[in-house]
Design a protein with these regions (language model features):
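Basic, low-complexity intrinsically disordered segments
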Residues: 1-81
Length: 81
């Protein structure tokens, strides 16, 4: 049986709230969300971030788990060395 330990995402959620409040251009926002999600090595970080963003900011679209994984891939492809 595979049991996962509960993971604390409060720091990630706080970083996401700060990004949403910063009123960044969309491309920069997506890159920064990718940075925040890529900083978490746990499996399920993109899903947790997606659920949080969709619940907290229901008027904003584009935060599905698949899109957050794409944001992470975008950040990892174009991050500054």
């Amino acid at each position: 049986m595979n049991i996962r330990k509960p993971t604390d995402y409060t720091a990630m959620f706080a970083a996401l709230d700060a990004l949403m409040a910063a009123q960044l251009p969309q491309m920069e926002l997506y890159c920064e969300i990718g940075r925040v999600v890529s900083g978490r090595s746990e499996k399920g970080a993109a899903v947790a971030a997606s659920e949080y963003l969709q619940d907290t900011y229901p008027a904003t679209e584009g935060f599905s788990p698949r899109n957050l994984r794409r944001m992470r891939a975008f950040y990892m492809a174009y991050e500054d060395p």
